[in-house]
Amino acid sequence: MSRRILGIDPGSLITGFGVIDVVGNQRHYVASGAIRTKSGSPLAERVKVLVDGIHQVIDTYRPTEAALERVFVNVNPAATLMLGQARGACMTALVLKDLPVAEYTALQVKQSVVGQGKAPKEQVQYMVVRMLNLSGTPQADAADALAVALTHANHSGGAIGKLALRGLKVRGGRLV
């Protein structure tokens, strides 16, 4: 059975997307790119650009499920808030199209794709290229989104992945 996964790396200015097909244990590249918003635009306009852009990706590539990177808290509270709003817009766009959504932290993505949680972005990009047999390196935000999609492909086949699609987590063998 084939699955098509849309991975999203949310950003307040650039939101990356990556689409892969999963057939058995094979992962195949479908598409990737970025949705860009204008930095000086009002928040409502930027949210609309994100929702419309994600809907266009969904309508074009018809994914069966989606994965989204979780927001990290950084030293700048305003930047964290903006990133959270962009992420909320992405989540809204996905659920409005009735896609099941799983969430992964940056640490989980790096561990899944590279094997260690403190891997630099360049190493993540390198592994995305290798895992999907790409001829070139995608733009950074698109590569991150492909890494999120690959992480979901790696985690979603078993029981834990099915729980993640329902928004549930397992830690230390316990449902949290």
From Swiss-Prot:
It comes from the Bacteria. Its main location: cytoplasm. Its EC number is 3.1.21.10. It is found in: Cytoplasm. Mg(2+) 1 binds at residues 9, 141. InterPro entries: RNaseH-like_sf (IPR012337), RNaseH_sf (IPR036397), X-over_junc_endoDNase_Mg_BS (IPR020563), X-over_junc_endoDNase_RuvC (IPR002176). Mg(2+) 2 binds at residue 69. One of its GO terms (biological process) is DNA recombination. The active site is at 9, 69, 141. Pfam families: RuvC. It is an enzyme of class 3 (hydrolase). Its cofactor is Mg(2+). It catalyses: Endonucleolytic cleavage at a junction such as a reciprocal single-stranded crossover between two homologous DNA duplexes (Holliday junction). Binds 2 Mg(2+) ion per subunit. Keywords: Cytoplasm, DNA damage, DNA recombination, DNA repair, DNA-binding, Endonuclease, Hydrolase, Magnesium, Metal-binding, Nuclease. SUPFAM superfamilies: Ribonuclease H-like (SSF53098). The keyword Transferase does not apply. The keyword Nuclease applies. One of its GO terms (molecular function) is magnesium ion binding. Belongs to the RuvC family. The RuvA-RuvB-RuvC complex processes Holliday junction (HJ) DNA during genetic recombination and DNA repair. Endonuclease that resolves HJ intermediates. Cleaves cruciform DNA by making single-stranded nicks across the HJ at symmetrical positions within the homologous arms, yielding a 5'-phosphate and a 3'-hydroxyl group; requires a central core of homology in the junction. The consensus cleavage sequence is 5'-(A/T)TT(C/G)-3'. Cleavage occurs on the 3'-side of the TT dinucleotide at the point of strand exchange. HAMAP family: RuvC. Homodimer which binds Holliday junction (HJ) DNA. The HJ becomes 2-fold symmetrical on binding to RuvC with unstacked arms; it has a different conformation from HJ DNA in complex with RuvA. In the full resolvosome a probable DNA-RuvA(4)-RuvB(12)-RuvC(2) complex forms which resolves the HJ. This is Crossover junction endodeoxyribonuclease RuvC. It comes from Chromobacterium violaceum (strain ATCC 12472 / DSM 30191 / JCM 1249 / CCUG 213 / NBRC 12614 / NCIMB 9131 / NCTC 9757 / MK). The lineage of its organism: Bacteria, Pseudomonadati, Pseudomonadota, Betaproteobacteria, Neisseriales.
